[in-house]
Amino acid sequence: MSNKKADSKPQAKYPVNLLDTPFPMRGDLPKREPQWVKEWEERGVYEKIRAASKGRPKFILHDGPPYANGDIHLGHAVNKILKDIVVKSRNMAGFDAPYVPGWDCHGMPIEIQIEKQFGKSLPAAEVMSKARAYATEQIEKQKAGFKRLGVLGDWADPYKTMNFVNEAEEIRALGKIIEKGYVYRGLKPVNWCFDCGSALAEAEVEYKDRTDPTIDVMFPFAEPEKTAQAFGLPALPRAEGGIVIWTTTPWTIPANQALNLHPEIVYALVDTERGLLIVAEERVAACMEEFKLSGRVVATAPGVKLVNLRFHHPLASAHPGYKRTAPVYLGDYVTTDTGTGVVHSSPAYGVEDFISCKTHGMTDSDIINPVMGDGRYIESLPLFGGLSIWDANPKVVDALRDAGTLLRSEKYTHSYMHCWRHKTPIIYRATSQWFAGMDVTPREGGKTLRETALEGVEATAFYPSWGKQRLFSMIANRPDWTLSRQRQWGVPMAFFVHKETGELHPRTLELLEEVAKRVEKSGIEAWQTLDPRELIGDDANLYEKNRDTLDVWFDSGTTHWHVLRGSHKDQLQFPADLYLEGSDQHRGWFHSSLLTASMLDGRAPYKGLLTHGFTVDGEGRKMSKSLGNGVDPHEVANRLGAEIIRLWIASTDYSGELAISEEILKRVTEGYRRIRNTLRFLLANLSDFDYAQHAVPVDEWLEIDRYAVAFSAQLQTELLAYYEKYEFHPVVAKLQTYCSEDLGGFYLDVLKDRLYTSAPDSRARRSAQTALYHLTQGLLRVLAPFLSFTAEEAWKVFQPASDTIFTETYYAYPDVADADALIDKWSLLRDVRGTVTKALEEARTANRIGSSLQAEVTVHASGARYDALASLGDDLKFVLITSAATVVKVDDEAQEGVDVAASKYQKCERCWHYREDVGAHADHPTLCGRCFSNLFENGEIRSAA
């Protein structure tokens, strides 16, 4: 390492110890970082970490797999860098913390890409082949992006849900939950996307505003006598009229099969210009105003009295196909917040409607379900056959108007379900699907899936803690899980069903294992090409292959099975210590993983869940193409450096939204420069220091050096406690304060005189360097999890014989006697120094002095402050950075203060102190006595600073 002195003339005559370092002031991050990424890979740094960590307690952060489609975005960067910080910090804390990245490879988005590129008519085998190739290409692209961010992991062998072994193990997991009795087939309304042509998981649904027609419709009386009796009347005053419903989905009217009233809500029979109308009593005034009618309440009755009354379908007069009646059922979900207090039920298109109708005895075959998977009505539907339901909306309104049953229609903007992929509206649609029953008791007995999952939530640590209630509520209130999808590129539900009854083949579990063995060799294509006779012989006449695929959330939700205990079981273990994802994953990966592990293992697959927020711009707005406020991590890395992204993420409280803007990045960059400058100072001043040769024993250090090490050790204890809780922003904040104030603003500031002017091999200077050595050891290691490039760059200068900083553990600082007392004492001294600095500033502003070294100060102090100051003796001037300092004892705080006077002496050319002995040696008229001693004699003696 260079030991070059600065070349100005005075220093050539009277040299000071100004050393150089190959660690540059400018990071030049965009240029240097890719070189580090390449070097880490070539030197096998990740493998070296694994070798160094072997035998330690395991810590498993299980990677939630990003989808193998598209470039990485800022959300990916946040997620992967947070994971990287956790893994590196756990390795350095003495754990064996491997990181196996993964990718989610099956599902709709990739199918859509293949359809876009090659059309919709490809044979299934070709779709799969092209989907595999596409996913592989996308993975390589994303992998390069993650590596560029400084993320270390097993990039050579990541897990992929499309790897044959993972596909096979997923089929085995399906077999296990079938064996336990959780899986059943049933007709139920599920989230259905017409563009996907498939059911959607809850996590695949998003809500956006949509404007639809809202209508109030009258269902005419079908049983006037019974209706009169229900209201306590001998007869209805007039024949015309009926019960009124309000809906925002006119397209569901053709499939109406019932009406729902709340048993305790009071309903009114109102005489109006349009006949007798039944609405909730508390909605009468609002309804009359909306219908532009005047009305008189004839009678009232609670909903329970109206049960089983029947009313004609509102389109009965428009077409014979609608000549049916709708019975009144009771439902607690009916409210009077809006509408009429009466809900029309189309059981095929609403979960509550479906449950109500099934509860009242309706069978699956009774349910009218005229909407096909592509969103069009069946051709045979009267009046609207073949129409898209969205196109049919206005036509249904017109038909109701013509039939005389429409009371009101207007446009209504409401939050409505949309497909997260296609951004198009979706519906609830009753289809025959395979479900995992939330309230099913497993065959071996015990608790239901819901109960087990809720216990799993209770047993999990949440970071931040509010995540617990969120996940608990979602599990407590969710419906049964729709496991099946109607797609090609997915893991098959590879069993055989009876062609007539739909029952599973009696040898299903055995057959699933046979299929899994084939998939393990050839992938899911083995199921597609399988001739049923190969496995079930003549039973193929009675049974057919199930064509459904598994929900992709089952793919990723079973990674604890097919990765932790499957493809990567040699490195990983179950349960994982931590799952770490964005807050949307409470209804996504956290959720599906909890359900599958509850079914397979009766417990959660994780010990802890860490949730981070989403990225927003500087004004708190979500990032979107329309606003043009997106931030590309590649662009930032290439312009400012990935280190700046890492520092931004680490310094932000990820439990909320993470705001980013040019102004924020500018502040982060300034903070980075301060840290880098601190490291440069440390490395430069250690460049002629060999610990084995020059280290001074701790009990021989100067007092301020012992304080600095004790303070740094105490700080490290605080930092590691934050790392332990995955709270990184306090780590960054404290380290930035440490670099700028504790070191730069105090200790290093005081140290400069000793480092630069003491004899190179003096105890005073070597004491300072020994302390700096320990500080550098500690600082680089606590920086390494987030400032990975910079810490490694500095480490290679500091410890060139070491492979990498990432095989190190956190530093064990030497024990300093009376550390707490030292910290207290020097905290007090720093307070006094702050007061003195302020007085010096005032003197400088008044032009009484130039630099602080031109000053001589007298500090009037009492009590502990006096004792602390006096204990430093002549070294006090070095702490205050003045040429002379005197302390005078006073009786109380009221008498305390600082006197500043300009020195009457000459300035030493070498140390810049103003001293009486400048020129005491005739041959050196510009040199002070201590510099003469440091250069030509035994050197000055210091004890404190």
Swiss-Prot record:
It is found in: Cytoplasm. It comes from the Bacteria. Zn(2+) binds at residues 908, 911, 928, 931. ATP binds at residue 625. Its EC number is 6.1.1.5. One of its GO terms (cellular component) is cytosol. Belongs to the class-I aminoacyl-tRNA synthetase family. IleS type 1 subfamily. Catalyzes the attachment of isoleucine to tRNA(Ile). As IleRS can inadvertently accommodate and process structurally similar amino acids such as valine, to avoid such errors it has two additional distinct tRNA(Ile)-dependent editing activities. One activity is designated as 'pretransfer' editing and involves the hydrolysis of activated Val-AMP. The other activity is designated 'posttransfer' editing and involves deacylation of mischarged Val-tRNA(Ile). This is Isoleucine--tRNA ligase. It comes from Burkholderia multivorans (strain ATCC 17616 / 249). The gene is ileS.
